[in-house]
A protein has these predicted regions:
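Short acidic-hydrophobic catalytic motif
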Residues: 33-342
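Short, positively charged and aromatic/hydrophobic N-terminal segments
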Residues: 9, 13, 22, 26, ...
Length: 342
């Protein structure tokens, strides 16, 4: 989950678009030197043993228990609501995306799970193909707002190789998605998984940031600590709409970049159960884990959202102004394309 972005000034936006287009042009050269028909395959993996977490949901504020279990080959990532009658269980795929406001929500009937992007990102990056997740509530625990604890838990329990090949889809031709709001995504052929994002905000603190991951092996070091973020001026409307009931300065990177009255700031910190802050001190309300942490978190989110295609991708994904709504729409279209070719 992370904050929505806006169009920058025209000159800057055109410059970013020019950079974005170079990836498409570079593809014609890249295609000449790589064998696009080759698919790097390996066997599927699941967890060697279970692990468990508990914590509050970012939006509901509920205390939720989450358990992660090994699963059989070709199961994929499945999520069970153990608190509901019959314990309904469905796969984490784009078919079930129902909402994308402040996070990715999967839903089918009474089965609903919110804020799935962080854990899906970690499972994908760590090479977990099959896993059963059980929850006793409607949302994944937010933990510290990053993928850190998921990565550490997966490393601690280890992985087990399974006697079945991974479901791999290799991109062989450029795919481009755009939206009327200025979001763009290129998916290019590559012999492994790589991704890059650029975010654009009309903010002196955020501005334009880029983050990239050249190999999933670097995920832990380069992305796992990047926390979800939001602007202080966005918090009050979210609270009034019944969102971020579990939000605090320990599970999100909060950015104070638009001055407000001390009374208004006190109201919000009191509502969140946090210590009061000085309304004159603009900036990040907690230390950054990376200089470009917001962009890195957007990349973390992108990996989680795109994992909903249900396949391991051999591709380079380049996204301009990504967000959950745009990411999952692209993922749905990509999944439909993949399934139509099976």
């Amino acid at each position: 989950m992370s904050s929505s972005s806006f169009l920058p000034e025209n000159n800057e936006y055109l410059h970013i678009l020019k950079i974005f287009r170079t990836f498409a042009l570079a593809f014609s050269l890249h295609k000449k030197i790589m064998n696009l028909s080759s698919i790097r395959t390996m066997n599927q993996h699941t967890l060697l043993s279970p692990f468990h977490f508990e914590g509050k949901g970012l939006h509901t504020g509920l205390h939720i228990h989450a358990s992660f279990y090994p699963a059989a080959p070709n199961t994929g990532i499945r999520i069970c609501r153990s608190d509901l009658e019959g314990q309904p269980t469905y796969p984490a795929v784009a078919d079930y995306v129902a909402a994308t406001e402040r996070g990715t929500v999967l839903e089918y009937g009474e089965w609903k799970v919110s804020t799935v992007e962080h854990v899906l990102s970690a499972l994908y990056a760590m090479g977990v193909d099959n896993c059963l997740i059980t929850l006793d509530g409607p949302e994944m625990p937010i933990l510290d707002g990053s993928a850190k604890y998921y990565i550490e838990a997966i490393e601690q329990v280890g992985l087990q190789e399974q006697d079945a090949p991974q479901k791999v889809y290799a991109i062989t031709e450029k795919i481009e998605y755009t939206s009327e709001q200025g979001n763009q995504m290129l998916i290019l052929p590559c012999d492994h998984y790589a991704a890059q994002v650029t975010i654009c905000y009309p903010s002196a603190l955020l501005g334009t940031q880029t983050a990239q991951l050249d190999d999933l092996a670097d995920y832990k070091q380069q992305l796992s600590l990047a926390r979800t973020f939001c602007l202080v001026r966005e918090i009050e409307p979210l609270l009034r709409r019944g969102l971020i009931k579990g939000g605090d300065l320990q599970n999100a990177l909060v950015i104070y970049e638009t001055p407000m009255s001390q009374d208004d700031l006190d109201f919000m910190t009191d509502k969140l159960g946090q210590p009061r802050l000085d309304a004159n001190q603009l900036g990040y309300l907690s230390p950054l884990n990376y200089p470009n942490e917001p962009a890195r978190h957007k990349l973390l989110d992108l990996i989680g959202d795109m994992s909903l295609c249900g396949f391991r991708l051999q591709a380079q994904i380049v996204a301009l102004r990504p967000g959950h709504s745009f990411n999952t729409k692209c993922c749905k279209q990509l999944r439909e394309k993949i399934l139509s070719e099976q």
